[in-house]
Amino acid sequence: MSNQMNTMDITEILKYLPHRYPFLLIDRVLDFTPGESLHAIKNVTINEPFFQGHFPIQPVMPGVLILEAMAQATGLLAFKTMSDDVPPPGVLYYFAGIDNARFRRVVEPGDQIHFEVKMIKERRGIGVFYGEAKVDGEVVCSAEIMCARREINQ
């Protein structure tokens, strides 16, 4: 087994995910093992557009966006499991379902969220994953996430 780290910077992430500002929520992949796991980060700053209304006096990252970022991490793992090549145009992984989502603490400006996702199974283009979001080593959110591979007409 190799000790080589598999990483992705933002330029590489943009080749795999269709999301763009303000909805691209993964900044970097620190490590991944295709078919097994992926570790990504999101740096949360006061400049995030959602903080204007959630909440101006006490800014808190919306939980649904933490889950969306986790789903983006699962999409990256799914793509890297499918092939090491950049996916062809029109191939996407859609957020297909969520189970057992739990929120344990708020995420605030200045936090760095670590997303650790593990592939549980994949069958016929449907992937099932378990993910945790952590800040300073403390779990802030956990969930089981499903994503579905689809080809869209362009």
Curated annotation (Swiss-Prot):
Q: Which GO terms describe its cellular component?
A: cytoplasm; membrane
Q: Which reaction does it catalyse?
A: a (3R)-hydroxyacyl-[ACP] = a (2E)-enoyl-[ACP] + H2O
Q: Which family does it belong to?
A: Belongs to the thioester dehydratase family. FabZ subfamily.
Protein name, per record: 3-hydroxyacyl-[acyl-carrier-protein] dehydratase FabZ
Active site at H54
Give the enzyme's EC designation: 4.2.1.59
What does this chain do? Involved in unsaturated fatty acids biosynthesis. Catalyzes the dehydration of short chain beta-hydroxyacyl-ACPs and long chain saturated and unsaturated beta-hydroxyacyl-ACPs.
Where is the protein situated, by its record's location annotation?
Answer: Cytoplasm
Biological source species: Shewanella oneidensis (strain ATCC 700550 / JCM 31522 / CIP 106686 / LMG 19005 / NCIMB 14063 / MR-1)
* InterPro entries referenced in this protein's UniProt entry, alphabetically: FabA_FabZ, FabZ, HotDog_dom_sf
> Would the keyword Lyase turn up in this protein's UniProt record?
yes
Q: Which NCBIfam families match?
A: fabZ (TIGR01750), PRK00006.1 (NF000582)
Carries keyword Cell cycle? no
Report the main location listed first in the record. cytoplasm
SUPFAM superfamilies linked: Thioesterase/thiol ester dehydrase-isomerase
A Gene Ontology molecular-function term?
(3R)-hydroxyacyl-[acyl-carrier-protein] dehydratase activity
Q: Which GO terms describe its biological process?
A: fatty acid biosynthetic process; lipid A biosynthetic process
UniProt keywords, alphabetically: Cytoplasm, Lipid A biosynthesis, Lipid biosynthesis, Lipid metabolism, Lyase
